[in-house]
Design a protein with these regions (language model features):
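Conserved beta-strand-loop surface patch within small alpha/beta domains used
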Residues: 1-93, 100-165
């Protein structure tokens, strides 16, 4: 099972079924999506990352103002977000994975952050050695001095080193 999962609302069997679905790339499997949602709600990003690595595919988790969780799966190198129907602005968090790769902001990611500057509070990319966070200072108060860019919309997003899982 998933380490330190005693407090999560899922059993070992549910985790194993989700892992099997991920390994078989059945990204619309109800057990996989339910487990991923539970992990996201619990802030267990290590579990979300493990499922992404097992599938060899990028995945995205979007959390809206009401804590609704929207999940998308993509290819090995990109995940396209579907419209979060019923979601409410602002979005609290956008998380996506770089399975088996470094946690960094790719050009696609920074384009997404720039476009989301008016509706997204925080973002995270899951990769190696752990999650890389960024906070949108135009929406959330931050005590931080480094930003992704010096000018333009990316000057609102903090530049932070990855942390360990």
């Amino acid at each position: 099972g998933l380490p330190d999962a005693e407090d999560l609302p899922m059993c070992d069997e549910g985790w194993e079924m989700a892992c099997q679905a991920a390994a078989e790339r059945r990204v619309d499997d109800v057990h996989l999506l339910q487990t991923q949602r539970q992990l996201a709600q619990a802030g267990r990003w290590d579990g979300v990352y493990i499922l992404s690595v097992m599938a060899g595919l990028e995945t995205s988790v979007l959390v809206d103002a009401d804590d609704q969780v929207f999940i998308d799966w993509g290819t090995a190198g990109q995940v396209t977000l579907q419209p979060p129907v019923g979601g409410r602005l602002p979005f609290k968090l956008w998380v996506h994975t770089h399975p088996r790769f470094a946690a960094y902001w790719s050009s696609t990611d920074t384009n997404s952050l720039a476009l989301g500057s008016g509706i997204l509070q925080t973002a995270m990319v899951l990769g190696q050695p752990g999650p890389k966070h960024s906070i949108n200072r135009s929406m959330v108060e931050v005590n931080h001095s480094e930003f992704i860019r010096e000018q333009g919309p990316l000057s609102q997003w903090t530049e932070e080193a990855p942390r360990y899982y």
